[in-house]
Curated annotation (Swiss-Prot):
Single GO MF annotation: nuclease activity
Stored Gene3D superfamilies: GIY-YIG endonuclease
SUPFAM superfamilies: GIY-YIG endonuclease
Keywords noted in UniProt: DNA damage, DNA excision, DNA repair, Excision nuclease, Hydrolase, SOS response
Hydrolase listed as a keyword: yes
Annotated organism of origin: Salmonella typhi
Protein name: Excinuclease cho
Listed GO CC annotations: excinuclease repair complex
InterPro entries: GIY-YIG_endonuc, GIY-YIG_endonuc_sf, GIY-YIG_UvrC_Cho, UvrABC_protein_C
Gene Ontology biological process terms from the UniProt entry: nucleotide-excision repair; SOS response
EC nos: 3.1.25.-
């Protein structure tokens, strides 16, 4: 008996059904080879499909049009718009704000995290603190930014496992004074719970291990302006407590943006901390009237 073979199953990969989006070609010809943010729009003007950033808008948009994996988004796109910035920093900041505000269909969602937590070290103890009760922009000795309390505790547990720190002294499990914990018997704890290591030595090891996660306090008295320039365009990014308040073409207009932010902006911190602390940009501290001579 001849076994009947079934027809091979067709795999509709993106590359197999991709067609170059000719309807978007006119927008590509107008796209500038400059830094900024670009937006793919559907027929609806209220819900963008995708928001991205680049130091060269034209080049980046072209790469989207040639990518089969983005066929679904490209088929829905009806037009492309863009906003030019003075440089990469402005593009990063504007992209993050627009994604958070407009929630594009094909972007990873960015939302204000109301459960944001950190680990605070004080008086030889560590505890989880929430951004709802502590100002992360100014509170010292904070380590790590976590989506919630559970994530913070998991990170602390991972650190304890790596460094053979004592769960009991870290508050991760109950401890009986003077008695070795279960992990000590397994050689997973250095013995701070039973006198094999002093509490001070244990604390110093914990402190050293956490240092790479330190949250940097806002180092200025108030708002600052970060200057970013390219030929034919200069922007002053107004920033306070790690929050980007917006950009203006001159310092005389800074007063229209300066305010004290409510809460801590995790996305702003991640974008701004390293560049601001590295000294790679010109920073101007803003006075009360926000005018510079």
């Amino acid at each position: 008996m001849v076994r009947r073979q079934s027809a091979p199953r067709l795999e509709f990969e993106a590359a197999a059904i991709y067609e170059y989006p000719e309807h978007l070609r006119p927008f590509l010809s107008e796209a500038p080879a400059l830094p900024g943010v670009y937006i793919f729009h559907s027929e609806s003007d209220t819900l963008p499909l995708y928001i991205g950033k680049s130091v060269n808008i034209r080049s980046r948009v072209l790469s989207h049009l040639r990518t089969p994996d983005e066929a679904a988004m490209l088929r829905q796109a009806r037009r492309i718009s863009w906003i030019c910035t003075a440089g990469e920093m402005g593009a990063l900041l504007l992209e993050a704000r627009l994604i958070k505000e407009q929630q594009p269909l094909f972007n990873k969602r960015l939302r204000r995290n109301r459960q944001l937590c950190s680990l605070q070290l004080s008086e030889q103890k560590i505890e989880v603190v929430s951004a709802r009760s502590v100002d992360f922009s100014h509170e010292p000795n904070l380590f790590g930014l976590f989506a919630n309390r559970r994530a913070a505790l998991q990170s602390l547990q991972n650190l304890a496992d790596e460094q053979k720190l004592c769960y009991g002294l870290l508050g991760l499990e109950p401890v009986s004074r003077g008695r070795a914990c279960f992990r000590f018997a397994l050689k997973r704890c250095a013995g701070a719970c039973c006198g094999q290591e002093t509490p001070q030595a244990h604390f110093l090891r914990l402190q050293a291990s956490l240092e790479r996660l330190r949250v940097v306090c806002w180092p200025w008295k108030g708002a600052i302006a970060l200057k970013e320039s390219r030929p034919q365009m200069t922007q002053f990014h107004i920033i306070n407590n790690w929050l980007w308040l917006g950009a203006v073409p001159s310092l005389d207009e800074a007063a229209t943006l300066v305010r004290t932010p409510a809460g801590f902006d995790q996305d702003g911190y991640k974008i701004l901390c390293k560049p601001l602390m590295s000294g790679q940009y010109e920073i101007i501290e803003l006075h009360t009237d926000c005018r510079q001579s």
